[in-house]
UniProtKB/Swiss-Prot annotation:
Taxonomy of the source species: Eukaryota, Metazoa, Ecdysozoa, Arthropoda, Hexapoda
GO CC term, one of those recorded: extracellular region
Cellular compartment(s): Secreted
Function: FMRFamides and FMRFamide-like peptides are neuropeptides.
Gene Ontology BP annotations: neuropeptide signaling pathway
Family: Belongs to the FARP (FMRF amide related peptide) family.
Protein's organism: Tyrannophasma gladiator (Gladiator)
Chief location bin: secreted
Keywords noted in UniProt: Amidation, Neuropeptide, Secreted
Name of this protein: Extended FMRFamide-12
């Protein structure tokens, strides 16, 4: 999934 503006479940590149 592309990097979202907010980590609403998609935190794969969110450090």
């Amino acid at each position: 999934s592309p990097v979202p503006e907010d980590d609403r479940g998609d935190n794969f590149v969110r450090l």
